[in-house]
Every structure is written in structure tokens, then in C-alpha cells.
């Protein structure tokens, strides 16, 4: 779990606070909260440790309970679209329309065929309600519930000057879910959540090496070595195997996008999240995609408070991208 607090400045944003709080394994599974009390307590501990006074927050959700689709609807006035969006959504989502929260963003108000193109987002009400409740139980006030893929996009676009011709594959690697978002000119062309993340490295190292979870996690991030200062070859072999599986999942999504999208000229891949610095994963992705790859810097254009630990911020910059995107949101915006 991460918290980011930004302050708007005349020429951009300034970072006031950043921190992370570990969650007990299986507390959240595929984006669904399994232990609400544990999540609320983790939020309280994080707020206390960072000495945060801000009560109004934005949060992100992901997983199979969230559906994002690009659809076309008959052109109509904005107020008519708002009134009819649930009827339109019913044709495109696998959930009952009364069981979901729905939002949308118009990407093209009028196509050549006289239709309106938009991104439709639907999330199960019970999942949204659970996330809102754990935040309230931590004595905070949720103002925005965003989608993780879009929050990472917001954080990325705030930090990078993009050529309108660039088509970027933005992949945020979470603990158990990775968010894939293909973006051009500020518009999301394709999104998909895949149920593989950084935990796959930890779990496989633990299984193959017969060691405790915390030691396996240390090996994953390069913090546990032999007496000679060398990561065991067995660990490297396991990391490479998981990297191949993960890269294969990402490539299948990219292949689907390329096969179904006209003018799909992808220019690069940008990784974010806790496992974005795993070098064997870089090699596996680059070999499959044949595209240049870089790791996101969430603080690239963010002013840093001199009292904050720059080494800590640098080490965890890729993990903060979603938090940066969320911290730029405010209640009532779109």
C-alpha cells in the first residue's frame, strides 16, 4: 500500500509526503478485499507514520471486478448520454447494470459515421463499496475512486513530454495484478489487467529454494546475497523463469492490440511498479516485443521537499506512479 501527497504549484506539483505500508499476504486477492480490518489498520498506521493531516483521498481499484471497454454509441447531447449510459452499458458488460458503478469518458464526440466514441468503465458495486468502507474505517474521506490503469497514465503523462505520434505501452506491475494501458495523445487505446505480478517472483523463489517469504522477497529485490556478495545462481534461474512467464502474458495483450487496431504503431514500453526494475524481466520483454523499454520515474517533473529522503524516493519511484496520478485528482473532476 502506498500514499502520495502532492501540492499544486504554479508551474507543476510538489511532493510533500510518500510512504508504503506492507499488507499481510491474501489481504487483497485479485483486487477484492478479503480482510477489511487489516486494510483499515494498515491505512491508519501509514497515516500515523507519515504524520498526514489530509483526510480527503483518492483511491484506485483493479482486477476482474473492473471492466473497461471502448465503445461507440449514437451521437447525442451530453445530458442525453449521461441519462442513457446505463442502457448502452448493458450491451457491453458481463454484469447486471444494477450491480455495477458506471462511468465514461468521451474520446471522440463525432466519428465519420456520426457516432460518439467513449471509454466505458464499470466496477462491481460491492467491490467499490468495500474499498470506500475501509478508507472510512481509517477515518478518511474518499473523494475519488479511480481505475489503477488510468491513475498510472495520469502520473506518467504529468512527468513526461510525449510526442503526439508516440504510442506507449504502460505496464504497472503490482503485487498480484499488472495493469496494461496503451496510450496515444492522452487517450487510452487499450487496457487489460492480468493476474500476475511481483508476488510471482517471491512465491517461486520461496518454493524452489525452500526459504521463508521475507528472505525470498529480499532475494527478489537484490537485498539478500551470499557471503561473497553474490545472488545464488538458483535464484537467478528462478527469476528468469518467472520473467519469461510474465513477459509472455504482457506480449499476448500487446499482440491482441496490434491485431485489432489500425495504425497501431507502438513506439516503446514503460514499466512501473515494484518489480519494474527486475533486469531479467527487462530482457524477456525486450526480446519478445522488440521495443525499447524504460522504467518510469514518478518524480521526474515533481518538485521534492528537501526534508524528504531522496535515496528512498529514488529507490521506490516506479512504485509511486499510481499514487502520483491519484494525488492529482480532486472530488468532482473527470
Model-derived features with residue positions:
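Active-site neighborhood for divalent-cation/phosphate handling
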Residues: 56, 60-160, 268, 298-305, ...
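Adenine-nucleotide phosphate-binding core of ATP-dependent small-molecule kinases
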Residues: 207, 218-268, 275, 322
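Glycine-rich phosphate-binding loops at beta-strand->alpha-helix junctions
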Residues: 242, 264-294, 298-300
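Short hinge/gating elements
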Residues: 25-32, 66-76, 107-109, 113-118, ...
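Non-catalytic, solvent-exposed interaction/assembly segments
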Residues: 1-88, 129-131, 137-141
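Phosphate/pyrophosphate-binding loops at sites that engage ATP/ADP/AMP, CoA/4′-phosphopantetheine
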Residues: 43-56, 138, 211, 251-268
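Small-residue (GG/TT-enriched) beta-loop-alpha framework at ligand/catalytic clefts
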Residues: 1-18, 59, 110-218, 246
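Glycine-rich phosphate-binding/hydrolytic loop that grips phosphoryl groups
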Residues: 154, 276, 294-334
